[in-house]
Amino acid sequence: LKSKREQLSSPAPNTVPWEALVGNAIGGDGRDITTPEDVDKDTIALIMYTSGTTGKPKGAMLSHGNLFSNLMQGKAWVPGLGDKPERMLAALPFFHAYGLTMNVTLAQFIGGELVILPKPDMSLIMQLMKKHTPTWVPGVPTLYERIVKAAEDQEIPIKGVRAAFSGASTLPSDTVKKWESYTGGLLVEGYGL
């Protein structure tokens, strides 16, 4: 059992440890990091685990090509995204493909700033909306409905939001109208069941 624990807690083969990645990147542009192998679009970048809603949970292997394609599709929904400095409200969990793509990888790709929420708490969201004025808000319909209601109730202007991207469930047309009227920005539906 001890040897199994040591094996599971030791560095994974053919990987760059997080500490080395961050440590090298702080002092330079990250180009000095040696990767353990050649990386191309078909190389597995990460494994995300499913919730098991239609069966047992399983690891979905995502390649570098998958991540890049998702990133480019997300960016294409909002023409001009990244042409100006962007500040993104990161209310989605990063352990989900939607949050990882529309917040983490997209922010890195366009050089955007992430305003990260430790938990989905409306009072915190509104404090951050007021303090940081995000320009990009990926989320779910309920998030947009609650932000507009809280902004109306607390008289917090949210006019700086240029674009929002909705997923996870169907986006009601009333939500789009209220959001776009209140923010002056665009709200598009990407994928909703």
Predicted segments — roles?
Residues L1-K41:
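ANL superfamily adenylate-forming
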Residues A91-H96, S169:
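Conserved AMP-binding
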Residues D121, T142-Y144, L171:
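Alpha-helix capping/helix-boundary segments
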